[in-house]
Amino acid sequence: MRPRHLLLAVGLAAVWGFNFVVMQVGLRHFPPLLYVTLRFTLAAFPALLFVGGPRAPWRWVLAAGATLGVMQYGLLLVGMRAGMPAGLSSLVVQIQAVFTVILATVLLGERITTRRITGMGVAFAGLALIALTLGDGSPTGAFVLVVASALCWGVGNIAVRKAAPPDSFRFTVWLSAVAALPMMGLSLLFEGVPHLTFSLEGTLSVLYVALISTLGGFGVWGFLLRRYDASVVAPYSLLVPVFGMSCAALFAGEPLSPVKLLAGALIVCGVLYAGTRPAGRTAAAPAEAGPAGPRPEPTGPHRERTAPRPRPDAPDTPDALSRTR
C-alpha cells in the first residue's frame, strides 16, 4: 500500500475508533433510538437524491438495513446508554468477525479451517475475560446487548454478501434510508414523542456519526478497496478498537486496566489469526488490473468472505460493510 493510502487507512481507523466516544457524547443529549434515527436520516438525505438505485436485490437491501442498521446500532446504542463504556464497546463489537465466520459456515456452507477455529477460540477467550471481570460500572445486561449487536452485525454481513453491491457508498446510503423509518417508529414506540433541545455538542455528535463516520468513512473504505485487495485493506479495521480504547481513555477518562488490554489483545489477535492465511501459502488466481499493474485476486479467508466478482473492474467489494466503523 502506498504511504498516503496507508495513512488514509490508519486515519479511517482513528475516525471509526473515535466514533464510539462521539456516540457516547451524543447519548447525553438524545435517547438511543432517536439518536440512531437522526444518524441514518442525515446519512440518507439528501444523498439519496444523487446516488441512484442500490444496484442490488431489494430483499438483501432490506435485510441489510434491518440487521446492520436497525438491530445492530439499536442494540449497540441502548447497551452504551445502559452503561457499556465507549472503549470497551469498540472492542467487544469486533467479535462480529467471529460470528460472521460461524454464520457463513452454517448458512452458506463455507469451509471452516483449523486456523479459523483456533482464532475464534482465542477471540472468544478475550470476550469471556471481559464478561468475567465486569464491575458495577459495566452492567452485565449492557454487555449482553453489545454482544447481541455484534451478532446482528454478523447476520448483516451475510446479507451484504448475498447482495454483492458493486458500490459500497451507494449501498450505505440506501442501507441508511431503509433503517431510518423503522428506527423512527421504534423510537416513538419505546421513547415517546421527543422533547428536543438541540445543543452544539449534541448536534456536532450527530453530524460526525452521520457525515464523517458513515458517509465519509465508507467513501474512503470503498476508495481503498478499489485500489487494493480486500485482504490488504481489511486488517486495518483491527486498529479501530485500539483507537477506540485510546480515545475513550484520553477524552472520556475510561481506565485502561491490564485485564482490558489482555482481553483486547486476545480478541484482536484471534480475529486477525482467523482471517488471514499462513505466510507463504498462496494460490494461483487470475490477474486483476490495478494502479500498479496486474495483481492477483485475493485468496484465503478474505476471498471466501467476499462475494464473487462478476467482472474484473468491479469498483468495490461487499466486505466494505463488514468492518467496524
Predicted region positions:
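Cytoplasmic-side transmembrane-helix entry/capping segments in multi-pass membrane proteins
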Residues: P57-T67, I112-F124, A142-F143, P166-S176, ...
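Juxtamembrane helix-entry segments on the extracytoplasmic side of multipass membrane proteins
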Residues: M1-L6, R28-L33, T37, G53-R59, ...
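Hydrophobic transmembrane alpha-helices of multi-pass small-molecule transport proteins
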Residues: T41, A47, L103, I112-L132, ...
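Hydrophobic alpha-helical transmembrane segments of multi-pass membrane transport proteins
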Residues: V10-F18, V22, L62-A82, I102-L103, ...
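Transmembrane alpha-helical segments that form core, pore/gating elements
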Residues: A43-A47, T100-V101, V106, G137-G192, ...
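Hydrophobic/aromatic residues within transmembrane alpha-helices
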Residues: G26, Y35, G79, V106-L108, ...
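Signature of the 12-TM Major Facilitator Superfamily
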Residues: L34-L38, W60, L88-L91, T114-I117, ...
